[in-house]
Protein backbone atom coordinates (compact mmCIF):
# COMPACT_ATOMS: atom_id res chain seq x y z
CA UNK A 1 0.00 0.00 0.00
CA UNK A 2 2.95 2.27 0.38
CA UNK A 3 3.90 4.57 3.24
CA UNK A 4 1.58 7.18 4.71
CA UNK A 5 1.94 10.56 6.37
CA UNK A 6 0.90 11.09 9.97
CA UNK A 7 -1.57 13.70 8.68
CA UNK A 8 -2.89 14.03 5.11
CA UNK A 9 -1.57 16.74 2.84
CA UNK A 10 -4.80 18.38 1.69
CA UNK A 11 -3.17 21.23 -0.23
CA UNK A 12 -4.73 21.17 -3.70
CA UNK A 13 -3.44 22.19 -7.11
CA UNK A 14 -6.55 23.44 -8.91
CA UNK A 15 -7.46 25.39 -12.01
CA UNK A 16 -10.19 26.24 -14.51
CA UNK A 17 -10.41 27.03 -18.21
CA UNK A 18 -13.06 27.82 -20.81
CA UNK A 19 -11.53 25.96 -23.73
CA UNK A 20 -10.44 27.28 -27.11
CA UNK A 21 -12.51 29.68 -29.25
CA UNK A 22 -13.15 27.03 -31.89
CA UNK A 23 -13.89 24.35 -29.32
CA UNK A 24 -15.35 25.83 -26.10
CA UNK A 25 -14.98 23.18 -23.43
CA UNK A 26 -15.18 24.56 -19.89
CA UNK A 27 -13.08 22.45 -17.54
CA UNK A 28 -11.83 22.37 -13.98
CA UNK A 29 -9.26 20.18 -12.28
CA UNK A 30 -7.76 19.55 -8.88
CA UNK A 31 -5.05 17.26 -7.51
CA UNK A 32 -4.27 16.37 -3.91
CA UNK A 33 -1.47 14.32 -2.36
CA UNK A 34 -3.60 13.04 0.51
CA UNK A 35 -2.13 10.50 2.92
CA UNK A 36 0.69 9.39 0.63
CA UNK A 37 4.24 10.50 1.37
CA UNK A 38 4.66 11.75 -2.20
CA UNK A 39 2.54 12.89 -5.12
CA UNK A 40 2.89 10.59 -8.12
CA UNK A 41 -0.05 11.78 -10.28
CA UNK A 42 0.15 14.09 -13.28
CA UNK A 43 -2.34 15.40 -15.83
CA UNK A 44 -2.85 17.38 -19.03
CA UNK A 45 -5.52 19.98 -19.78
CA UNK A 46 -4.86 21.15 -23.35
CA UNK A 47 -7.95 22.79 -24.89
CA UNK A 48 -6.18 23.25 -28.22
CA UNK A 49 -3.86 20.37 -29.07
CA UNK A 50 -4.34 21.59 -32.61
CA UNK A 51 -6.88 23.88 -34.26
CA UNK A 52 -9.67 21.32 -33.97
CA UNK A 53 -8.63 18.93 -31.20
CA UNK A 54 -8.59 19.14 -27.39
CA UNK A 55 -6.74 16.75 -25.08
CA UNK A 56 -7.36 15.90 -21.43
CA UNK A 57 -5.50 13.16 -19.56
CA UNK A 58 -4.59 11.75 -16.15
CA UNK A 59 -1.50 9.71 -15.27
CA UNK A 60 -1.26 7.76 -12.02
CA UNK A 61 2.39 6.92 -11.33
CA UNK A 62 3.69 4.06 -9.21
CA UNK A 63 7.20 3.43 -7.96
CA UNK A 64 7.86 7.15 -8.37
CA UNK A 65 6.46 10.21 -10.10
CA UNK A 66 8.95 10.33 -12.97
CA UNK A 67 7.12 8.32 -15.65
CA UNK A 68 3.83 10.12 -15.02
CA UNK A 69 5.50 13.53 -15.28
CA UNK A 70 7.41 12.45 -18.38
CA UNK A 71 4.18 11.38 -20.08
CA UNK A 72 2.46 14.65 -19.18
CA UNK A 73 5.36 16.55 -20.69
CA UNK A 74 5.93 14.61 -23.90
CA UNK A 75 2.90 12.46 -24.78
CA UNK A 76 0.88 15.32 -26.36
CA UNK A 77 3.62 16.03 -28.90
CA UNK A 78 4.25 12.32 -29.48
CA UNK A 79 0.56 11.90 -30.32
CA UNK A 80 0.71 14.75 -32.84
CA UNK A 81 3.88 13.33 -34.39
CA UNK A 82 2.24 10.01 -35.25
CA UNK A 83 1.60 9.40 -38.94
CA UNK A 84 -1.91 8.19 -38.17
CA UNK A 85 -2.70 11.44 -36.36
CA UNK A 86 -1.71 13.49 -39.39
CA UNK A 87 -3.98 11.26 -41.48
CA UNK A 88 -6.90 11.87 -39.12
CA UNK A 89 -6.86 8.34 -37.68
CA UNK A 90 -6.99 9.26 -34.00
CA UNK A 91 -7.60 5.76 -32.64
CA UNK A 92 -4.53 4.36 -34.35
CA UNK A 93 -2.54 7.45 -33.39
CA UNK A 94 -3.28 6.96 -29.70
CA UNK A 95 -2.28 3.30 -29.77
CA UNK A 96 0.94 4.08 -31.63
CA UNK A 97 1.75 6.98 -29.29
CA UNK A 98 1.33 4.87 -26.14
CA UNK A 99 3.69 2.20 -27.50
CA UNK A 100 6.12 4.83 -28.79
CA UNK A 101 6.54 6.67 -25.49
CA UNK A 102 6.81 3.34 -23.68
CA UNK A 103 9.68 2.32 -25.98
CA UNK A 104 11.45 5.65 -25.41
CA UNK A 105 11.67 4.92 -21.68
CA UNK A 106 14.34 2.28 -22.37
CA UNK A 107 16.74 4.68 -24.13
CA UNK A 108 19.76 5.94 -22.23
CA UNK A 109 18.89 9.59 -22.78
CA UNK A 110 15.37 9.23 -21.40
CA UNK A 111 16.53 7.10 -18.47
CA UNK A 112 18.86 9.93 -17.44
CA UNK A 113 16.03 12.45 -17.70
CA UNK A 114 13.76 10.22 -15.64
CA UNK A 115 16.51 9.86 -13.04
CA UNK A 116 16.77 13.65 -12.80
CA UNK A 117 13.01 13.97 -12.36
CA UNK A 118 13.04 11.29 -9.68
CA UNK A 119 16.13 12.64 -7.94
CA UNK A 120 17.97 9.36 -8.43
CA UNK A 121 21.73 9.28 -9.05
CA UNK A 122 22.76 8.38 -12.58
CA UNK A 123 25.20 5.57 -13.38
CA UNK A 124 27.99 8.10 -13.88
CA UNK A 125 27.39 9.50 -10.41
CA UNK A 126 27.32 5.97 -8.98
CA UNK A 127 30.65 5.19 -10.64
CA UNK A 128 32.20 8.35 -9.21
CA UNK A 129 30.98 7.44 -5.73
CA UNK A 130 32.38 3.92 -6.10
CA UNK A 131 35.78 5.24 -7.21
CA UNK A 132 35.84 7.64 -4.28
CA UNK A 133 34.97 4.84 -1.85
CA UNK A 134 37.68 2.60 -3.30
CA UNK A 135 40.24 5.40 -2.99
CA UNK A 136 39.30 5.87 0.66
CA UNK A 137 39.70 2.14 1.32
CA UNK A 138 43.08 2.07 -0.44
CA UNK A 139 44.32 5.01 1.62
CA UNK A 140 43.18 3.39 4.87
CA UNK A 141 44.85 0.10 3.95
CA UNK A 142 48.09 1.83 3.03
CA UNK A 143 48.13 3.69 6.33
CA UNK A 144 47.42 0.47 8.25
CA UNK A 145 50.16 -1.48 6.46
CA UNK A 146 52.67 1.31 7.01
CA UNK A 147 51.82 1.45 10.70
CA UNK A 148 52.21 -2.32 11.14
CA UNK A 149 55.49 -2.34 9.20
CA UNK A 150 57.06 -0.04 11.79
CA UNK A 151 55.74 -1.96 14.82
CA UNK A 152 57.79 -4.42 16.86
CA UNK A 153 56.80 -8.08 17.24
CA UNK A 154 55.71 -7.40 20.81
CA UNK A 155 53.42 -4.58 19.68
CA UNK A 156 51.95 -6.75 16.96
CA UNK A 157 51.36 -9.58 19.45
CA UNK A 158 49.69 -7.12 21.79
CA UNK A 159 47.40 -5.89 19.02
CA UNK A 160 46.52 -9.34 17.67
CA UNK A 161 47.33 -11.45 20.73
CA UNK A 162 43.76 -12.56 21.24
CA UNK A 163 43.90 -14.25 17.83
CA UNK A 164 47.13 -16.17 18.43
CA UNK A 165 45.74 -18.76 20.85
CA UNK A 166 44.92 -22.16 19.39
CA UNK A 167 41.18 -22.82 19.27
CA UNK A 168 40.17 -26.35 20.35
CA UNK A 169 38.74 -28.38 17.47
CA UNK A 170 35.38 -29.00 19.17
CA UNK A 171 34.79 -25.24 19.61
CA UNK A 172 36.23 -24.08 16.33
CA UNK A 173 33.34 -24.78 13.97
CA UNK A 174 31.98 -21.60 12.42
CA UNK A 175 34.96 -19.42 13.32
CA UNK A 176 36.59 -17.80 10.34
CA UNK A 177 33.99 -19.11 7.93
CA UNK A 178 31.59 -16.18 7.92
CA UNK A 179 30.91 -14.04 4.92
CA UNK A 180 32.19 -10.93 6.66
CA UNK A 181 35.49 -11.72 8.48
CA UNK A 182 37.11 -9.28 10.82
CA UNK A 183 40.85 -8.40 10.86
CA UNK A 184 43.05 -11.45 10.51
CA UNK A 185 45.47 -12.69 13.16
CA UNK A 186 49.12 -13.39 12.42
CA UNK A 187 48.45 -17.13 12.23
CA UNK A 188 45.71 -16.64 9.64
CA UNK A 189 42.76 -17.36 11.94
CA UNK A 190 39.83 -15.00 12.00
CA UNK A 191 39.71 -12.43 14.75
CA UNK A 192 36.64 -10.91 16.42
CA UNK A 193 34.11 -9.19 14.24
CA UNK A 194 34.75 -5.59 13.41
CA UNK A 195 31.56 -3.62 14.15
CA UNK A 196 32.31 -1.39 11.20
CA UNK A 197 31.97 -4.36 8.84
CA UNK A 198 28.54 -5.57 9.90
CA UNK A 199 26.13 -6.08 7.03
CA UNK A 200 23.99 -2.97 6.75
CA UNK A 201 20.24 -3.23 6.79
CA UNK A 202 18.49 -2.92 3.46
CA UNK A 203 18.34 0.60 2.19
CA UNK A 204 15.17 2.20 1.02
CA UNK A 205 14.68 2.39 -2.70
CA UNK A 206 15.18 5.60 -4.62
CA UNK A 207 13.26 8.48 -3.13
CA UNK A 208 10.75 10.45 -5.04
CA UNK A 209 9.62 13.91 -3.99
CA UNK A 210 5.99 14.58 -4.66
CA UNK A 211 4.53 17.33 -6.86
CA UNK A 212 0.93 18.48 -6.86
CA UNK A 213 0.53 18.09 -10.59
CA UNK A 214 1.74 18.76 -14.09
CA UNK A 215 -0.81 20.67 -16.09
CA UNK A 216 -1.48 23.26 -18.73
CA UNK A 217 -3.68 26.10 -17.55
CA UNK A 218 -3.27 27.98 -20.82
CA UNK A 219 -6.43 28.30 -22.85
CA UNK A 220 -4.40 28.40 -26.04
CA UNK A 221 -1.24 26.58 -26.99
CA UNK A 222 -0.23 23.01 -27.48
CA UNK A 223 2.47 22.51 -24.90
CA UNK A 224 1.90 20.17 -21.99
CA UNK A 225 2.41 22.96 -19.50
CA UNK A 226 4.72 23.43 -16.57
CA UNK A 227 5.25 21.55 -13.35
CA UNK A 228 3.14 23.00 -10.57
CA UNK A 229 4.71 24.05 -7.32
CA UNK A 230 5.12 21.24 -4.80
CA UNK A 231 2.54 21.16 -2.06
CA UNK A 232 3.51 21.43 1.56
CA UNK A 233 4.20 18.41 3.74
CA UNK A 234 5.67 16.43 0.88
CA UNK A 235 7.59 13.38 1.95
CA UNK A 236 10.14 10.92 0.69
CA UNK A 237 9.87 7.18 0.43
CA UNK A 238 11.09 4.27 -1.62
CA UNK A 239 9.11 2.74 -4.45
CA UNK A 240 5.84 1.12 -3.41
CA UNK A 241 5.59 -2.64 -3.22
CA UNK A 242 3.48 -2.72 -6.35
CA UNK A 243 6.39 -1.98 -8.63
CA UNK A 244 9.75 -2.14 -6.92
CA UNK A 245 11.65 -3.61 -4.01
CA UNK A 246 14.24 -2.33 -1.60
CA UNK A 247 17.82 -2.34 -2.74
CA UNK A 248 19.93 -5.31 -1.82
CA UNK A 249 22.63 -4.53 0.75
CA UNK A 250 26.05 -4.01 -0.71
CA UNK A 251 29.25 -4.45 1.35
CA UNK A 252 32.63 -3.62 -0.16
CA UNK A 253 35.50 -5.89 0.82
CA UNK A 254 39.04 -4.61 0.63
CA UNK A 255 41.76 -6.62 -1.06
CA UNK A 256 43.68 -6.64 2.22
CA UNK A 257 40.92 -8.60 3.96
CA UNK A 258 40.34 -10.85 0.94
CA UNK A 259 43.99 -11.97 0.93
CA UNK A 260 43.89 -12.65 4.64
CA UNK A 261 40.63 -14.56 4.24
CA UNK A 262 42.26 -16.85 1.65
CA UNK A 263 45.12 -17.61 4.03
CA UNK A 264 42.63 -18.33 6.82
CA UNK A 265 40.74 -20.77 4.60
CA UNK A 266 43.94 -22.76 3.90
CA UNK A 267 44.74 -23.11 7.60
CA UNK A 268 41.17 -24.14 8.38
CA UNK A 269 41.21 -26.83 5.69
CA UNK A 270 44.25 -28.45 7.32
CA UNK A 271 42.60 -28.38 10.74
CA UNK A 272 39.36 -29.77 9.32
CA UNK A 273 41.32 -32.79 8.00
CA UNK A 274 42.64 -33.53 11.48
CA UNK A 275 39.16 -33.22 12.96
CA UNK A 276 37.65 -35.87 10.65
CA UNK A 277 39.32 -38.72 12.58
CA UNK A 278 37.86 -37.68 15.92
CA UNK A 279 34.42 -37.25 14.36
CA UNK A 280 34.58 -40.77 12.87
CA UNK A 281 35.40 -42.23 16.28
CA UNK A 282 32.24 -40.70 17.70
CA UNK A 283 30.22 -42.47 15.00
CA UNK A 284 29.19 -39.25 13.28
CA UNK A 285 30.98 -38.67 10.01
CA UNK A 286 31.65 -35.32 8.43
CA UNK A 287 30.03 -36.65 5.24
CA UNK A 288 26.69 -37.02 7.05
CA UNK A 289 27.03 -33.53 8.43
CA UNK A 290 27.74 -32.20 4.97
CA UNK A 291 24.64 -33.96 3.60
CA UNK A 292 22.50 -32.31 6.26
CA UNK A 293 24.05 -28.95 5.49
CA UNK A 294 23.40 -29.45 1.78
CA UNK A 295 19.74 -30.19 2.50
CA UNK A 296 19.48 -27.08 4.66
CA UNK A 297 21.11 -25.02 1.94
CA UNK A 298 18.69 -26.40 -0.65
CA UNK A 299 15.69 -25.52 1.52
CA UNK A 300 17.06 -22.04 2.13
CA UNK A 301 17.68 -21.57 -1.59
CA UNK A 302 14.11 -22.58 -2.37
CA UNK A 303 12.81 -20.12 0.22
CA UNK A 304 14.99 -17.41 -1.28
CA UNK A 305 13.61 -18.19 -4.74
CA UNK A 306 10.07 -17.81 -3.43
CA UNK A 307 10.93 -14.50 -1.82
CA UNK A 308 12.52 -13.21 -5.02
CA UNK A 309 9.43 -14.21 -7.00
CA UNK A 310 7.27 -12.21 -4.61
CA UNK A 311 9.47 -9.13 -4.94
CA UNK A 312 10.35 -8.87 -8.63
CA UNK A 313 12.30 -5.66 -8.34
CA UNK A 314 15.13 -7.53 -6.58
CA UNK A 315 16.16 -9.13 -9.86
CA UNK A 316 15.26 -6.28 -12.20
CA UNK A 317 17.11 -3.11 -12.94
CA UNK A 318 16.79 -0.45 -10.29
CA UNK A 319 16.31 2.37 -12.73
CA UNK A 320 13.36 4.63 -13.57
CA UNK A 321 11.07 3.21 -16.19
CA UNK A 322 12.05 -0.32 -15.20
CA UNK A 323 10.92 -0.34 -11.58
CA UNK A 324 8.44 2.52 -12.03
CA UNK A 325 5.59 3.30 -14.39
CA UNK A 326 2.23 4.98 -14.80
CA UNK A 327 -1.33 4.43 -15.89
CA UNK A 328 -2.62 6.69 -18.66
CA UNK A 329 -6.13 7.67 -19.68
CA UNK A 330 -6.22 10.16 -22.56
CA UNK A 331 -9.32 11.78 -24.08
CA UNK A 332 -9.25 13.55 -27.45
CA UNK A 333 -12.22 15.66 -28.55
CA UNK A 334 -12.49 16.60 -32.21
CA UNK A 335 -15.79 18.04 -33.33
CA UNK A 336 -18.50 15.70 -32.06
CA UNK A 337 -16.12 12.77 -31.65
CA UNK A 338 -14.75 11.70 -28.26
CA UNK A 339 -11.88 9.19 -28.45
CA UNK A 340 -10.56 7.74 -25.17
CA UNK A 341 -7.42 5.61 -24.80
CA UNK A 342 -6.72 3.86 -21.53
CA UNK A 343 -3.95 1.69 -20.09
CA UNK A 344 -4.32 0.86 -16.40
CA UNK A 345 -7.03 1.57 -13.85
CA UNK A 346 -7.54 5.30 -14.19
CA UNK A 347 -10.93 6.00 -15.72
CA UNK A 348 -12.97 8.26 -17.99
CA UNK A 349 -16.74 8.52 -17.43
CA UNK A 350 -19.33 10.50 -19.42
CA UNK A 351 -22.63 11.73 -18.01
CA UNK A 352 -25.33 10.82 -20.54
CA UNK A 353 -28.65 12.30 -19.40
CA UNK A 354 -27.52 11.75 -15.83
CA UNK A 355 -26.40 8.14 -16.38
CA UNK A 356 -22.74 7.15 -16.03
CA UNK A 357 -21.22 5.87 -19.27
CA UNK A 358 -17.79 4.29 -18.80
CA UNK A 359 -15.42 5.27 -21.60
CA UNK A 360 -12.57 3.11 -20.32
CA UNK A 361 -11.98 -0.33 -18.89
CA UNK A 362 -9.94 -0.97 -15.73
CA UNK A 363 -7.09 -3.36 -16.54
CA UNK A 364 -6.62 -5.85 -13.71
CA UNK A 365 -4.33 -8.94 -13.82
CA UNK A 366 -7.07 -11.37 -12.81
CA UNK A 367 -9.30 -10.46 -15.78
CA UNK A 368 -9.58 -13.28 -18.31
CA UNK A 369 -7.99 -11.48 -21.27
CA UNK A 370 -5.22 -9.97 -19.16
CA UNK A 371 -4.50 -13.23 -17.32
CA UNK A 372 -4.12 -15.14 -20.59
CA UNK A 373 -1.58 -12.64 -21.89
CA UNK A 374 0.37 -12.63 -18.61
CA UNK A 375 0.63 -16.42 -18.56
CA UNK A 376 1.58 -16.56 -22.23
CA UNK A 377 4.44 -14.15 -21.50
CA UNK A 378 5.73 -16.42 -18.72
CA UNK A 379 4.20 -14.66 -15.75
CA UNK A 380 1.67 -15.56 -13.09
CA UNK A 381 -0.93 -13.78 -11.00
CA UNK A 382 -0.88 -14.32 -7.24
CA UNK A 383 -3.95 -14.75 -5.05
CA UNK A 384 -3.96 -11.04 -4.19
CA UNK A 385 -4.13 -10.08 -7.88
CA UNK A 386 -0.52 -9.11 -8.51
CA UNK A 387 1.67 -9.97 -11.49
CA UNK A 388 4.48 -12.19 -10.15
CA UNK A 389 3.56 -10.91 -6.70
CA UNK A 390 4.44 -7.33 -7.62
CA UNK A 391 2.37 -4.99 -9.79
CA UNK A 392 -1.41 -4.96 -9.34
CA UNK A 393 -1.97 -3.63 -12.86
CA UNK A 394 -1.86 -5.48 -16.16
CA UNK A 395 -1.28 -2.49 -18.46
CA UNK A 396 0.94 0.52 -17.90
CA UNK A 397 3.55 2.74 -19.49
CA UNK A 398 6.97 1.90 -18.05
CA UNK A 399 7.49 -1.09 -15.71
CA UNK A 400 9.96 -2.58 -18.20
CA UNK A 401 11.06 -5.18 -15.68
CA UNK A 402 7.90 -7.02 -16.75
CA UNK A 403 8.56 -6.51 -20.47
CA UNK A 404 11.67 -8.62 -21.01
CA UNK A 405 10.34 -11.54 -23.07
CA UNK A 406 12.37 -11.18 -26.26
CA UNK A 407 10.13 -13.59 -28.14
CA UNK A 408 7.05 -11.38 -27.84
CA UNK A 409 6.15 -7.93 -29.21
CA UNK A 410 5.57 -5.06 -26.74
CA UNK A 411 1.79 -5.37 -26.78
CA UNK A 412 1.97 -9.03 -25.69
CA UNK A 413 4.30 -8.64 -22.71
CA UNK A 414 3.15 -9.41 -19.15
CA UNK A 415 2.52 -5.70 -18.65
CA UNK A 416 1.41 -4.05 -21.87
CA UNK A 417 1.30 -0.36 -22.78
CA UNK A 418 -1.23 -0.98 -25.55
CA UNK A 419 -4.38 1.00 -24.65
CA UNK A 420 -8.00 0.06 -25.13
CA UNK A 421 -9.86 2.57 -27.31
CA UNK A 422 -13.47 3.71 -27.02
CA UNK A 423 -15.22 6.20 -29.32
CA UNK A 424 -18.40 8.19 -28.65
CA UNK A 425 -20.37 10.56 -30.86
CA UNK A 426 -21.46 13.43 -28.63
CA UNK A 427 -25.10 14.53 -28.55
CA UNK A 428 -27.19 16.93 -26.48
CA UNK A 429 -27.67 14.18 -23.90
CA UNK A 430 -23.96 14.21 -23.05
CA UNK A 431 -23.40 16.85 -20.38
CA UNK A 432 -19.88 16.39 -19.05
CA UNK A 433 -17.12 13.85 -18.58
CA UNK A 434 -14.88 13.01 -15.65
CA UNK A 435 -11.29 11.78 -15.90
CA UNK A 436 -9.69 10.63 -12.66
CA UNK A 437 -7.18 8.24 -11.13
CA UNK A 438 -8.15 5.24 -9.01
CA UNK A 439 -7.82 7.34 -5.86
CA UNK A 440 -11.34 8.47 -6.76
CA UNK A 441 -12.75 5.31 -8.32
CA UNK A 442 -11.69 3.07 -5.44
CA UNK A 443 -13.92 5.14 -3.16
CA UNK A 444 -16.89 6.01 -5.38
CA UNK A 445 -18.49 4.26 -8.33
CA UNK A 446 -18.85 5.89 -11.74
CA UNK A 447 -22.53 6.61 -11.10
CA UNK A 448 -21.85 8.02 -7.64
CA UNK A 449 -19.31 10.46 -9.08
CA UNK A 450 -21.72 11.53 -11.83
CA UNK A 451 -24.51 12.03 -9.28
CA UNK A 452 -22.20 14.04 -7.03
CA UNK A 453 -21.17 16.39 -9.84
CA UNK A 454 -24.73 16.61 -11.20
CA UNK A 455 -25.93 17.86 -7.82
CA UNK A 456 -23.27 20.59 -7.70
CA UNK A 457 -22.81 21.76 -11.28
CA UNK A 458 -25.85 24.09 -11.28
CA UNK A 459 -25.22 25.51 -7.82
CA UNK A 460 -24.44 29.20 -7.44
CA UNK A 461 -22.08 30.91 -5.09
CA UNK A 462 -22.89 33.82 -2.78
CA UNK A 463 -22.56 36.25 -5.70
CA UNK A 464 -25.08 34.38 -7.79
CA UNK A 465 -22.43 32.94 -10.10
CA UNK A 466 -22.23 29.32 -11.11
CA UNK A 467 -19.66 27.40 -9.10
CA UNK A 468 -16.24 26.90 -10.60
CA UNK A 469 -15.76 23.36 -11.80
CA UNK A 470 -12.50 23.15 -9.85
CA UNK A 471 -14.37 23.87 -6.61
CA UNK A 472 -16.64 20.91 -7.31
CA UNK A 473 -13.59 18.71 -7.89
CA UNK A 474 -12.02 19.92 -4.65
CA UNK A 475 -15.16 18.99 -2.75
CA UNK A 476 -15.10 15.58 -4.44
CA UNK A 477 -11.51 15.00 -3.33
CA UNK A 478 -12.36 15.90 0.25
CA UNK A 479 -15.35 13.57 0.07
CA UNK A 480 -13.08 10.67 -1.01
CA UNK A 481 -10.32 11.33 1.54
CA UNK A 482 -10.21 8.75 4.32
CA UNK A 483 -10.34 10.06 7.92
CA UNK A 484 -7.33 7.90 8.82
CA UNK A 485 -5.13 5.09 7.48
CA UNK A 486 -6.49 2.30 9.66
CA UNK A 487 -8.53 0.74 6.86
CA UNK A 488 -7.58 -1.15 3.72
CA UNK A 489 -6.07 1.91 2.04
CA UNK A 490 -9.29 3.14 0.44
CA UNK A 491 -9.26 6.93 0.41
CA UNK A 492 -5.55 7.10 1.23
CA UNK A 493 -4.20 7.38 -2.32
CA UNK A 494 -3.18 10.39 -4.41
CA UNK A 495 -6.20 11.96 -6.09
CA UNK A 496 -6.46 13.78 -9.42
CA UNK A 497 -9.70 14.60 -11.23
CA UNK A 498 -10.78 16.69 -14.23
CA UNK A 499 -14.33 17.73 -15.15
CA UNK A 500 -14.95 18.76 -18.78
CA UNK A 501 -18.31 20.19 -19.85
CA UNK A 502 -19.42 19.57 -23.43
CA UNK A 503 -21.49 22.75 -23.45
CA UNK A 504 -20.48 26.33 -22.63
CA UNK A 505 -21.19 27.17 -19.00
CA UNK A 506 -23.38 30.17 -19.96
CA UNK A 507 -25.82 27.70 -21.54
CA UNK A 508 -25.89 25.77 -18.30
CA UNK A 509 -26.41 29.04 -16.45
CA UNK A 510 -29.42 30.01 -18.56
CA UNK A 511 -30.97 26.57 -18.11
CA UNK A 512 -30.49 26.70 -14.36
CA UNK A 513 -31.88 30.22 -14.15
CA UNK A 514 -34.96 29.61 -16.27
CA UNK A 515 -36.51 27.28 -13.71
CA UNK A 516 -36.21 29.86 -10.93
CA UNK A 517 -36.88 33.11 -12.73
CA UNK A 518 -40.09 34.93 -11.86
CA UNK A 519 -42.55 35.83 -14.60
CA UNK A 520 -42.09 39.57 -14.05
CA UNK A 521 -38.32 39.28 -14.41
CA UNK A 522 -38.72 37.27 -17.59
CA UNK A 523 -41.09 39.85 -19.08
CA UNK A 524 -38.85 42.77 -18.16
CA UNK A 525 -35.88 41.02 -19.69
CA UNK A 526 -37.78 40.35 -22.89
CA UNK A 527 -38.90 43.98 -23.02
CA UNK A 528 -35.34 45.19 -22.67
CA UNK A 529 -34.24 42.88 -25.45
CA UNK A 530 -37.00 44.16 -27.76
CA UNK A 531 -36.00 47.78 -27.10
CA UNK A 532 -32.42 46.98 -27.88
CA UNK A 533 -33.38 45.24 -31.11
CA UNK A 534 -35.57 48.16 -32.28
CA UNK A 535 -32.73 50.60 -31.64
CA UNK A 536 -30.45 48.47 -33.78
CA UNK A 537 -32.99 48.40 -36.59
CA UNK A 538 -33.30 52.18 -36.50
CA UNK A 539 -29.57 52.55 -36.65
CA UNK A 540 -29.42 50.30 -39.71
CA UNK A 541 -32.12 52.30 -41.50
CA UNK A 542 -30.30 55.53 -40.76
UniProtKB/Swiss-Prot annotation:
Induction entry: By FGF-4 and serum.
GO cellular component entries: membrane; nucleoplasm; nucleus
GO biological process: regulation of cell cycle
Residues with the Phosphoserine modification: 524
Subunit text: Interacts with NOL3; may dephosphorylate NOL3.
Expression sites by tissue: Highly expressed in testis. Low level of expression in kidney. Also expressed in a number of tissues undergoing proliferation including embryo, uterus at pregnancy, placenta, and ovaries.
Keyword line: Acetylation, Cell cycle, Hydrolase, Lipoprotein, Magnesium, Manganese, Membrane, Metal-binding, Methylation, Myristate, Nucleus, Phosphoprotein, Protein phosphatase, Repeat
Disordered: region residues: 117-136, 164-325, 513-542
Co-factor(s): Mg(2+); Mn(2+)
Residue numbers carrying Omega-N-methylarginine: 22
Lipidation (N-myristoyl glycine): 2
Role according to the record: May be involved in regulation of cell cycle.
Cofactor descriptive note: Binds 2 magnesium or manganese ions per subunit.
Annotated disulfide bonds: none
Phosphothreonine, modified sites: 122
Reaction catalyzed: O-phospho-L-seryl-[protein] + H2O = L-seryl-[protein] + phosphate; O-phospho-L-threonyl-[protein] + H2O = L-threonyl-[protein] + phosphate
Residue ranges of every copy of the PPM-type phosphatase domain listed in the record: 26-502
Name of the protein: Protein phosphatase 1G
UniProt record similarity statement: Belongs to the PP2C family.
Amino acid sequence: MGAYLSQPNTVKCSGDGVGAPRLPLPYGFSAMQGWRVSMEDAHNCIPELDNETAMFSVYDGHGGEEVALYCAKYLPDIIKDQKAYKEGKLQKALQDAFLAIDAKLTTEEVIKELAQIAGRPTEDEDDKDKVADEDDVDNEEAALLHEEATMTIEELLTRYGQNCQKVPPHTKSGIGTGDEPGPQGLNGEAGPEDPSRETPSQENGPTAKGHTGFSSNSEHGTEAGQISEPGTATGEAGPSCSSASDKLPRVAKSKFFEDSEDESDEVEEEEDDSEECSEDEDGYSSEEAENEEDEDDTEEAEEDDDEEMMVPGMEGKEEPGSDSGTTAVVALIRGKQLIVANAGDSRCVVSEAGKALDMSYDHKPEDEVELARIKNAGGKVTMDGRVNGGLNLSRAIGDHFYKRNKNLPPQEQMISALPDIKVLTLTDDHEFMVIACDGIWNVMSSQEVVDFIQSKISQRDENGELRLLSSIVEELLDQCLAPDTSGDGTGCDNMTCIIICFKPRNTVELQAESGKRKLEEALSTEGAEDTGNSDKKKAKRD
